[in-house]
Swiss-Prot record:
The keyword RNA-binding appears for this protein: no
Protein name: Enolase
Cofactor binding: number and manner: Binds a second Mg(2+) ion via substrate during catalysis.
Positions of (2R)-2-phosphoglycerate binding: Q163, K339, R368, S369, K390
MF-aspect GO terms: magnesium ion binding; phosphopyruvate hydratase activity
Reaction equations catalysed: (2R)-2-phosphoglycerate = phosphoenolpyruvate + H2O
Organism for this UniProt entry: Bacillus cytotoxicus (strain DSM 22905 / CIP 110041 / 391-98 / NVH 391-98)
Binding-site residues, Mg(2+): D242, E287, D314
EC numbers: 4.2.1.11
Length: 430
């Protein structure tokens, strides 16, 4: 009854109007699972390969018909007959079938679609919510949201260098209240920007994308919005930044070209800059503060700020246990961003989260800039008790879908639901 009898993929669209892969899995007993694969704008060079067709006559070369074909003609025959609850076995079979270190043959978008759809079908088969199926009865922690309310960098068409400026409503007693706080600050920010005569259009992840004079000014207007909403910055709400510095790192000069600031900085100068910002603003999290290959710079940043600021490796670690193990060994950063499509299977995703926790690193489950209505990452965050989630702003249905799923989960958990807020940053000295 739990045997997989059919796997089917199709080409659908993501939140940017670009093609992506959707996969459906069916079992002998009638269980069903469906999953859609996200896509990133700023991608690390060590990420698993997202297979695109390259045919300029279709979707500007971004079609995924080859990935769809790989599911339907190569992966499906391999996993039909598997028990749907054998997640690790199915993921391992697909990894071996691909045979490359970066899933470049079949495509991480093909493999991940199947991996997630299998999990959904298995949860349907056993009659459990996905978070409970994946995490067991210990799955009860709702994540602290990192809400991206100002977009810059490659996520927006403006002159702000840093890619994301986030609010973290750590002072809320429940996840439900954290969402309310975030929404109120978001709407207050819209009013602040409007009063300043600034653009209130939103970027890929639902945050505003105004032309501001500097990265510092972005932090200043967020503080103003927090206060306008009736909250205290540094108490109720903290700040976070995804710098995505690889996007403006100049490999030829070895410097960081911040066009919005009108400056080029060395690694040491960037660390000085972050230290200065952290003194002036209640910043609790910095992601990809230096280039993914600037390990010496990351080491310096960790030495200077690692005890009081969460330093998240995204492009640095790419949800890869080998990269993370190297970072842990060298004492670089203290947190990892978890993106399922960076590594390509749920099994490997869970292994990365487990490795991080064993080493005392935090794990932040994350969306991508090209998202869909699929809310699997919400269930993953609760299943693993990750403690933090980064899934965009308080606008755009592709972002809100994850928050709404978490609200449902909190409601379902009832009295056993846990929202740790500031405690989810367990490796920082408060």
């Amino acid at each position: 009854m739990s045997t997989i009898i059919d796997v089917y993929a199709r080409e659908v669209l993501d939140s940017r109007g670009n093609p992506t892969v959707e996969v459906e899995v069916y079992t002998e007993g009638g269980a069903f699972g469906r999953a859609l694969v996200p896509s990133g704008a700023s991608t690390g060079e060590y990420e698993a390969v997202e297979l695109r067709d390259g045919d300029k006559s279709r979707y500007l070369g971004k079609g995924v018909l080859n990935a769809v074909k790989n599911v339907n003609e190569i992966i499906a025959p391999e996993i039909v007959g598997f028990d749907v609850t054998d997640q690790a076995g199915i993921d391992r079979a697909m990894i071996e079938l691909d045979g490359t270190p970066n899933k470049g043959k079949l495509g991480a978008n093909a493999i991940l679609g199947v991996s997630m759809a299998v999990a959904h079908a298995a949860a349907d088969f056993v009659g459990l919510p996905l978070y409970r199926y994946l995490g067991g009865f210990n799955a009860k922690q709702l994540p602290t949201p990192m809400m991206n309310i100002i977009n810059g960098g490659s996520h927006a068409d403006n002159n702000v260098d840093f890619q994301e400026f986030m609010i973290l409503p750590v002072g809320a007693p429940t996840f439900k209240e954290s969402i309310r706080m975030g929404a109120e600050v978001f709407h207050a920010l819209k009013a602040v920007l409007h009063d300043k005569g600034l653009n209130t259009a939103v970027g890929d992840e639902g945050g505003f994308a105004p032309n501001l004079g500097s990265n510092r000014e972005a932090l200043e207007v967020i503080i103003e919005a927090i206060e306008k909403a009736g909250y205290k910055a540094g108490e109720d709400v903290f700040l976070g930044m995804d710098v995505a510095s690889s996007e403006f790192y100049n490999k030829e000069t070895g410097k960081y070209d911040l066009s919005g600031e009108g400056r080029s900085m060395t690694s040491a100068e960037m660390v000085d800059f972050y230290e200065e910002l952290c003194k002036d603003f209640p910043i609790i999290s910095i992601e990809d503060g230096l280039d993914e290959n600037d390990w010496d710079g990351h080491k310096l940043l960790t030495e200077r700020l690692g005890k009081k600021v969460q330093l998240v490796g995204d492009d640095l670690f790419v949800t890869n246990t080998k990269k993370l193990a190297e970072g842990i060994e060298k004492g670089i950063s203290n947190s990892i961003l978890i993106k399922v499509n960076q590594i390509g299977t749920l099994t490997e995703t869970f292994e990365a989260i487990e490795m991080a926790k064993r080493a005392g690193y935090t794990a932040v489950v994350s969306h991508r800039s090209g998202e869909t209505e699929d809310a699997t990452i919400a269930d993953i965050a609760v299943a693993t008790n990750a403690g933090q989630i980064k899934t965009g702003s308080m606008s755009r249905t592709d972002r809100i879908a994850k928050y709404n799923q978490l609200l449902r989960i909190e409601d379902e958990l009832g009295e056993i639901a846990v929202y740790d807020g500031l405690k989810s940053f367990y490796n920082l000295k408060k």
